[in-house]
């Protein structure tokens, strides 16, 4: 680890198992500049942060027993997390969270929703709500399938 490998034209590549924060930030900014040059949407998102869209379900004691964490940008709703407490599952709370998020996304001008789920999570639930698989990666982690899903609003 960390040993330089000589390449053509006087360049070298070095592998490291330690974080070089300055180098990582430089590389991130270089890719951002490239993206901004080629995509008006990437440029636009830099001027406005994605708008959070969070919905919480609380019990009578005020404890969180379910929720959806998402954001809207580029005309999309991105659902990052949807969770309902074990004893409250299969009672329609997940459906309510999705419906509320989709309705708010429409008011924000969104036309699509995207989310990810694992094979041990909720693919069937999302499919029943009109979502479809647009990509999958088997073996991530081993023995599991990771799905990308979308829905047009």
Where are these regions (language model features)?
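A conserved beta-turn-beta hairpin within the catalytic core of GNAT-like acetyltransferases
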Residues: 71-80, 89, 141-145
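Conserved catalytic-core motifs of GNAT/GCN5-like acyltransferases
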Residues: 114-116, 132-150
């Amino acid at each position: 680890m960390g040993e330089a490998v000589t390449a053509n034209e006087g360049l070298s590549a070095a592998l490291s198992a330690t974080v070089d924060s300055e180098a990582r930030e430089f590389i991130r900014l270089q890719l951002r500049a490239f993206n901004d040059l080629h995509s008006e949407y990437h440029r636009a998102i830099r001027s406005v942060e994605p708008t959070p869209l969070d919905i919480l379900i609380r019990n009578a004691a005020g404890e969180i027993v379910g929720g959806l964490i998402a954001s809207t940008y580029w005309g999309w709703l991105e659902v990052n997390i949807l969770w309902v407490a074990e004893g409250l599952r299969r009672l329609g709370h997940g459906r309510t969270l999705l419906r509320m998020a989709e309705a708010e996304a429409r008011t924000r001008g969104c036309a699509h929703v995207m989310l990810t789920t694992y094979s041990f999570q909720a693919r069937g639930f999302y499919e029943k709500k009109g979502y479809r698989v647009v990509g999958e990666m088997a073996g991530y982690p081993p023995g599991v399938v990771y799905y990308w899903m979308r829905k047009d609003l």
